[in-house]
């Protein structure tokens, strides 16, 4: 096959393609004439291949050409712009590696072009005036990263932490003076003004090495469990402060680790040392849109897996922080704040409570800060994530003041979530000079095809002009980016990843991104989350099963009557159940699954279908996409006459009961299906597999990495519903013939989870990132400052104007409420009077200033 051909990175397509064209000149002339015959247009990969095959009459010649080098190039082309007589190709030979060429259809001459030139070529299809304007806005973030080291191998993408450790080892190795940046960094470590690890008496690398040697010899002579307090005074005599460990043995390990780094740094010791550095105590996490809460929120608009992810993340990170702080020998109380929006019209949730403890944690809270209308009142109602942009800058200012008050100082790490949370995290990290991590969860640009070049058509509804601009700002501002899978960053051999789609793109009439984000940037890291195993455990663990919930679940699945909670019924309860649970929107593709089922008679004969998704009545929803999908669901149930075979249950918010629901589906020997058009990760896939359910999941995105196809589950192509339906039906037919096959797949799925997906691994990795990147960014401070200034300009001249143009939903209603927000509708945390230090007063004053636009 053409896709199996080798291609050396050093080879240039512009150099090698002319010879290949000459060897098949007659056939390729016909092919290119066919490409240009229909005038200017954009051709996707499948269209390119179809046109190539149609232009070749001889089957043997066809196969020879398709299997050869030219076939390989066209197979690797993601899209081509046709502007007769030219055809410009965007060729992606490997993940993250792009080359652009244009071919003259008459003489088959080939010319290499830059990403910017290709984008101008493409813009001509949509806005020729903009494309030809020499002064059209072009942004090139890559030009500001020229001295930043980058990974080079596609297989290494996402291993940023490992790469950074290697590079730091190389840069700091050699002469003792090269270690000065590390010494300077260690001298900055403190907790509320109290020095950690070393004090100012150690002002040279040689003094540090001497102190380490003396201390290591000393603790080597002590019983290994001797508490730090027993020898704290001796350490201080050598210029060493607390933070090395809680026992003599732990101190010895940390001392030795740093000594090894200073003597001959290597990546392993470098990463190990920074995992022990006491630099992170207080963390702020932003998740702004939707209804963020701990109960009665799942299934509400813009509220789904991200909420579950963050709550589990917080519990895991607090547990890891507490363990680290204890092992560091410190008596410090860590704090984690999840910043979200306070919504006065809370719809029966606690989203109107200002400060709420996170369940099953000691020191973590949800802090809710309201959006403000233009006249300063609290915005009462929910706002779609697509309409949120006019509120974010002021929200960042108000959040900053609250954070500094509650934490009594700056946080040590800020993590953003989704576009809105990442933008606000960028604003605050720049304002407070704090290390920033970002998590996309989903990048809308990849969900909607051609949403960049066709942004005008979608902007009134989705405001992608704001969203894509905000995404580019936060990606480039962030110190590190957390992803759940490789595919999220760089996709697969055939298809670019979410982030890779932002490498070079254009929004004609708005902005051209000659370089947006480079997936070889060492800021990219993969940290796969897990599932809460106290809730999601195998159906075979009978002693833990929540049998008290079985009557409720039985009614939910099998009662015959339509209610406000469910419609449809299952006439034959002896059939296995295929089950799906997700938000009811286009991308989650629940209606697609219903259509697959409705079209496949064999599948309908073998199994029942149960879906948990959204609301059942369109009149009860305010979400545009959900309303469309609700109506589509009703139409599909009528069209395929599914009553008796389908149960549609409205969104369920009780995670504990949902865990038992998964297990009850497993009791029927059923399966879980995740049919999304694209899924960045797939928490429900992890949950289902944790419960022992054989799982079918989309091959578009993260689930393709979670599941080993045919072993621990199955991949389905959401674009080909008939094929997906056949694959699911074949599985159940095989299980009917061989019942042990179901158990085999179930067991393999559980094994996959236990080997790869736990929250403990996740929390350890993310905290290591926070510590390591805090030092890493000091090594290229000047370049980083230059890029921040560039980003500040871009924020001010581009994003701010775009955000102002978005209508402020609900402002008129808020103005009509003359008394503002009724006190009974917002639960405010008790006021605490604290004496403020001079530094706290300064920080509080800073909080009142406008954020200097971090990105």
Swiss-Prot record:
It catalyses: an NDP-alpha-D-glucose + D-fructose = a ribonucleoside 5'-diphosphate + sucrose + H(+). It is a peripheral membrane protein. Keywords: Cytoplasm, Glycosyltransferase, Membrane, Transferase. It comes from the Eukaryota. It is found in: Cytoplasm; Membrane. InterPro entries: Glyco_trans_1, Sucrose_synth_GT-B1, Sucrose_synthase_pln/cyn, SUS_EPBD, SUS_N. Signal peptide: none annotated. GO terms for cellular component: cytoplasm; membrane. Predominantly expressed in roots, flowers and immature seeds. The keyword Glycoprotein does not apply. Residues 279-758 are annotated as: GT-B glycosyltransferase. Sucrose-cleaving enzyme that provides UDP-glucose and fructose for various metabolic pathways. This is Sucrose synthase 7.
């Amino acid at each position: 096959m053409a896709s199996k051909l080798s291609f050396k990175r050093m080879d240039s397509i512009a150099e090698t393609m002319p010879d290949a064209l000459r060897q098949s000149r007659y056939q390729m002339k016909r092919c290119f004439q066919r490409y240009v015959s229909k005038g200017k247009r954009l051709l996707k990969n499948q269209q390119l291949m179809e046109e190539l095959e149609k232009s070749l009459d001889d089957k043997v010649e066809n196969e020879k050409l398709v299997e050869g080098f030219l076939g390989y190039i066209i197979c690797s082309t993601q899209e081509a712009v046709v502007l007769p007589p030219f055809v410009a190709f965007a060729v992606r030979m490997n993940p993250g590696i792009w080359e652009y060429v244009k071919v003259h259809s008459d003489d088959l001459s080939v010319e290499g072009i830059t990403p910017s030139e290709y984008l101008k070529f493409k813009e001509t299809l949509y806005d020729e005036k903009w494309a030809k304007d020499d002064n059209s806005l072009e942004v090139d973030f890559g030009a500001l990263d020229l001295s930043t080291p980058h990974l080079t191998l596609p297989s290494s993408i996402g291993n940023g932490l490992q790469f950074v450790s290697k590079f730091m080892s190389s840069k700091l190795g050699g002469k003792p003076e090269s270690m000065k940046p590390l010494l300077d960094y260690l001298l900055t470590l403190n907790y509320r003004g109290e020095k950690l690890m070393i004090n100012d008496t150690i002002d040279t690398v040689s003094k540090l090495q001497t102190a380490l040697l003396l201390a290591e010899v000393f603790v080597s002579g002590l019983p290994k469990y001797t508490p730090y307090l027993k020898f704290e005074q001796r350490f201080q005599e050598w210029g060493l402060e607390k933070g090395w460990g809680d026992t003599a043995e732990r101190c010895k390990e940390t001392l030795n680790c740093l000594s090894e780094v200073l003597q001959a740094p290597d990546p392993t010791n470098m990463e190990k040392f920074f995992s022990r550095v006491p630099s992170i105590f207080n963390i702020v996490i932003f998740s702004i849109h939707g209804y963020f809460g701990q109960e009665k929120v799942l299934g509400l608009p813009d509220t789904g897996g991200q909420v579950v992810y963050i709550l589990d993340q917080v519990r895991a990170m607090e547990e890891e922080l507490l363990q680290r702080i204890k092992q560091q020998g410190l008596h410090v109380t860590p704090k984690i704040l999840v910043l979200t929006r306070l919504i006065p019209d809370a719809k029966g949730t606690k989203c109107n409570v200002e400060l709420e403890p996170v369940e099953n944690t000691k020191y973590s809270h949800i802090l809710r800060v309201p959006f403000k209308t233009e006249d300063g009142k609290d915005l009462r109602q929910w706002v779609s994530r697509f309409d949120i942009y006019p509120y974010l800058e002021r929200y960042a200012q108000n959040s900053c003041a609250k954070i500094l008050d509650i934490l009594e100082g700056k946080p040590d790490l800020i993590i953003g979530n989704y576009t809105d949370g990442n933008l606000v995290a960028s604003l605050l990290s720049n304002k407070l000079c704090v290390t920033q991590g970002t998590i996309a969860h989903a990048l809308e640009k990849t969900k909607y095809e051609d949403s960049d070049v066709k942004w005008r058509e979608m902007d009134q509804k989705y405001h992608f002009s704001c969203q894509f601009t905000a995404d580019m700002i936060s990606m480039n501002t962030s110190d590190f980016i957390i992803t759940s899978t490789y595919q999220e960053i760089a996709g697969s051999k055939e298809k670019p990843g979410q982030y890779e789609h932002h490498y070079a793109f254009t929004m004609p009439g708005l902005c051209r991104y000659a370089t947006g984000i480079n997936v070889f940037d060492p800021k990219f890291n993969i940290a796969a989350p897990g599932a809460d195993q106290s809730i999601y455990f195998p159906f075979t663990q009978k002693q833990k099963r929540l049998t008290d919930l079985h009557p409720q679940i039985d009614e939910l699945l099998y009662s015959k009557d339509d209610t406000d909670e469910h419609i449809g019924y299952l006439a034959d309860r002896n059939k296995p159940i295929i089950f799906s649970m997700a938000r009811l929107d286009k991308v989650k593709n629940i209606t697609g699954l219903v259509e697959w089922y409705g079209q496949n008679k064999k599948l309908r004969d073998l199994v029942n279908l149960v879906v948990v998704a959204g609301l059942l009545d369109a009149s009860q929803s305010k979400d545009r996409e959900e309303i469309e999908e609700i109506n589509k669901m009703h139409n599909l149930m009528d069209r395929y006459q599914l009553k008796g075979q389908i149960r549609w249950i409205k969104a369920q918010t009780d995670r504990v009961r949902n865990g038992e629901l998964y297990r009850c589906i497993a009791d029927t020997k059923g399966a879980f299906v995740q049919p999304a058009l694209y899924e960045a990760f797939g928490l429900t896939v992890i949950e289902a597999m944790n419960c022992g359910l054989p799982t079918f999941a989309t091959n578009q995105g993260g689930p393709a990495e979670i599941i080993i196809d045919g072993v621990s589950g199955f991949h389905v192509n959401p674009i080909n519903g008939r094929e997906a339906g056949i694959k699911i039906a074949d599985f159940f037919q095989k299980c009917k013939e061989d019942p042990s096959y179901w158990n085999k797949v179930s067991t393999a799925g559980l094994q996959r989870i236990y080997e790869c997906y736990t929250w403990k691994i996740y929390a350890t990795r993310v905290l290591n990132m926070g510590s390591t990147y805090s030092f890493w960014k000091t090594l290229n401070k000047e370049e980083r400052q230059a890029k921040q200034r560039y980003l500040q300009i871009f924020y001010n001249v581009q994003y701010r104007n775009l955000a102002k143009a978005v209508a402020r939903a609900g402002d008129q209603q808020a103005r009509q409420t003359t008394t503002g927000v009724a006190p009974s509708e917002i639960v405010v945390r008790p006021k605490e009077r604290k004496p403020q230090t001079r530094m706290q007063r300064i920080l509080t004053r800073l909080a009142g200033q406008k954020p200097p636009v971090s990105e």
